[in-house]
Regions:
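Soluble, acidic/polar mature domains that operate outside membranes
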Residues: 2-524
Length: 524
């Protein structure tokens, strides 16, 4: 049995040796030959004068040696839309469009333009000697697109771009004074074959960052030439250490409290205020808004009376933008004075153009800190349901000092409040803060405001001498029209005004004031 096993091992070893020999002598050469036939060695193409092989793949022909951005001085382009030149400034080493230096050029756009002009990797070299340029849209009479790349060392490269090849994958091209015909990738169609406007980033105003947008000094919105909203940043609140209701002041339509939440939505848009596309660029030597014909084409028949005008300022940099309907659903035309361009802008980018004034205004009428108030004068009448006067109120409070050192004196008694009565007065102060706007007067059908009866007046003199005067006019059983320093377009609940009058009287006379009580709780 052992002998048979040894014989089998010898036979198998011999067979393995024979098969191995056959593989190396017969099969291996055949497989190698077949592999060579399937994957023949590609010899690098013969280069013409001026050409270069792509160093990465070793086979793509470049029409001229690859040029990087750091080597470039300028790129001059002529195509069916006109001409433009992108050049490197000697002053700051940045790239600009010649004659349109104010036009924004993004880093991404510049990178694409630089690659298109500096890397001429060909799809193929069709022929080394073209006999008929007209067949490819490259004859002189065809007026082919053209670009000239100038390097900092003085070297220039000039390329003509002809027809699109049938497959759409590239364009016929030639190098100036060279007979060879090439095909360049169709990626050049988004950089070298477009109008200047396509390459200009449609920025509209100064771009704010996340640290500064909330510090925007001024914001003004006009509609049809009329001021609609005017808000400023109150720098006095900065680093004051005091608790404030808002760091913004509203100057128009009145001295109302700014709705900080909604206004923040506005300011946030300044971090990336740009359009969807640039449609017109003005030159450095002439502002577009000076050309009435051009402006009219984009809906700006009268720049001083534009449908919408947006202005904002941060420090010494200001931005002014006009908006007009574009005729394209969901878009405006916008003209930027800062960049001298007209862009197509999505309505969603600037939704506040269509807001009403109440969107910018907090429901809270009065919002000043008690530490900033000098005097409060309150007068008025409380009437019953029949309009009969039930009580007349006339109270004045002097406020001196701040915080725990504040001293409050009702003029009617001439005696400063004790600590407990100061605490009670602060309940009344909260009642002042809780008189809220309820809605628009224009929806109430009041035709003649001059005939409305004044039922209350609250005059607040601030430490800085400024005055806020609130007047309330009865026009229904439940509502009052309110004005702030003579301006008004809103109404409040009459019961809140009556509670304000009643609590002023109670505070002056040392009676308990509860901000949570309804006026009806006093009279029931």
């Amino acid at each position: 049995m052992v002998k048979k096993q040894k014989i089998m091992l010898i036979v198998m070893a011999s067979l393995f040796a024979v098969l191995t020999l056959l593989y190396f002598l017969v099969f291996a050469p055949l497989l190698e030959k077949k592999n060579e036939e399937a994957n023949p060695t590609v010899e690098p193409p013969t280069l013409l004068d001026g050409e270069q092989l792509d160093k990465d793949d070793g086979k793509t022909i470049l029409m001229f040696p690859y040029a990087e951005r750091k080597e470039m001085k300028s790129i001059e382009v002529i195509n069916q839309y006109g001409s433009f030149t992108c050049y490197r400034s000697d002053e700051d080493d940045n790239f600009y469009f010649k004659g349109y230096e104010q036009a924004p050029l993004s880093a991404d756009t510049l990178a694409s333009l630089v690659v298109s002009a500096g890397y001429t990797g060909t799809v193929e070299r069709v022929t080394e000697k073209c006999e008929d340029w007209g067949m490819y849209g490259l004859a002189e009479e065809d007026e082919p697109a053209y670009y000239k790349l100038t390097l900092l060392n003085g070297t220039t490269h000039e390329i003509y771009i002809g027809d699109l090849i049938k497959s759409g994958g590239g364009y016929y091209a030639r190098y100036k004074d060279r007979d060879a015909l090439y095909v360049l990738s169709n990626t050049i169609q988004s950089t070298l074959l477009v109008p200047l406007e396509t390459l200009v980033t449609p920025y509209l105003g100064m771009l704010m960052d996340q640290q500064s947008y909330a510090l925007t000094d001024e914001f003004i919105l006009l509609k049809n030439g009329e001021t609609f909203v005017y808000i400023t940043y109150d720098k006095s609140t900065q680093n004051s250490g005091e608790s404030v209701f808002s760091v913004y002041d509203m100057h128009y339509p009145g001295q109302y409290t700014v709705n900080d939440s909604k206004y923040t939505e506005v300011l946030l848009t300044f971090c990336n205020l740009q359009g969807a596309a640039t449609v017109k660029v003005g030159g450095t030597d002439k502002m577009l808004h000076e050309d009435e014909e051009v402006m009219a084409q984009y809906g700006f028949e009268n720049v001083s009376n534009a449908p919408y005008e947006l202005y904002y300022r941060y420090g010494d940099q200001d931005s002014l933008i006009l908006f007009a309907p574009s005729g394209i659903e969901g878009y405006y035309f916008a003209y930027s004075y800062l960049y001298n361009l007209i862009a197509l802008v999505e309505e969603a980018t600037v939704p506040y153009l269509e807001w009403n004034t109440k969107d910018f205004i907090s429901d809270q009428l009065f919002h000043e800190s008690i530490n900033d108030v000098y005097d409060i004068e309150i007068s008025g009448v409380i009437t019953n349901g029949a309009g009969v006067v039930e009580k007349e109120i006339d109270e004045t409070f002097n406020l001196r000092g701040t915080g725990n050192d504040i001293e409050i004196t009702p003029v009617s008694t001439g005696k400063p409040f004790s600590t407990d009565l100061i605490r009670n007065f602060k309940q009344f102060y909260m009642v002042m803060l809780l008189v809220n706007i309820q809605g628009y007067m224009k929806t109430e059908g009041v035709e003649d405001y001059s005939k409305l009866e004044e039922i209350a007046c609250v005059k607040v003199t601030m430490d800085d001498g400024s005055i806020l005067e609130y007047k309330y006019y009865s026009y229904s059983a439940r509502r009052c029209y309110v004005t702030v320093n003579g301006e008004g377009e809103f109404y409040v609940n009459k019961k809140d005004v009556f509670k304000l009058l009643c609590d002023a009287n109670r505070a002056a006379n040392g009676l308990t004031v509860d901000r949570n009580m309804e006026y009806s709780d006093y009279v029931d």
